Amino acid sequence: MSQFWRLDGPLQTLILAAEQERLPQVIYWGPPLPASEDCAALAAAHAMDVTGGMLDANPELSICPEASQSFPGQPGLICRDAQGRVLHPKFRYVQELAQEHSLCLTYADKDLDLTYEAHFELTASSNMISCWSRLEASQPLMLHWLAAPVFPAPQLSDAMMSFSGRWIGEFQTHSIPWRPGIHKRESRSGRSGHEHFPGLILPEIGARNTLGRAYGFHYGWSGGHQMIAEELPDGRRQIQFGHACDSHNGLAQSF
């Protein structure tokens, strides 16, 4: 069974797709698509072929990649129970709350009593997509990492634009070539600043200040944060933003 959700604005469309009630993945994020667009055809075009030496199925790059699905990169959630055992949730669909410009998806792992929520909101006035995630547990646990809903990075990009700086030297840009593995920026100072601006721009090849296409990310949090841009062994790319690892001291049930 396939499920599809979409948010439409005057300048962009976001489409998510899920299979077998698993967590969805972003299959399209770009210029507006007509309401009649065949989402099933888009999902089929988005799927990767299986070749020699590969697994029978490619683990999905979902909005919260799961280690339990043999995802080969950075998972979207890393947590432990009160005894320190690593938890590997398998989230399944529970419900959705869809409005014209917002979407809330709820998933749960009944065995571990964990509930995950992903929120998406497209503000028509700014044409920006805001998204955030929540985790609820029936028993106290220790959270190491929880990413905001994860987005794929464009394949037509050969570099990313990151930012650093200092007093009277703000917003210095750095072009970082894409390569296999993780590029990580982290602020553990408890605040944002010139040194670790929580933003990223992904220009497609040939994009300039006045032409071409680019994708922008900004983590709306003025505290410690972490950004991960990863190219997987199979060539797919993901962008994760979240609070700095181990920001939550001690045990808790709501994150």
Language-model region placement:
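Polysaccharide-binding surfaces and accessory modules of carbohydrate-active proteins
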Residues: 3-6, 10, 14, 24-249
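Contiguous, structured surface segment used for ligand recognition
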Residues: 17
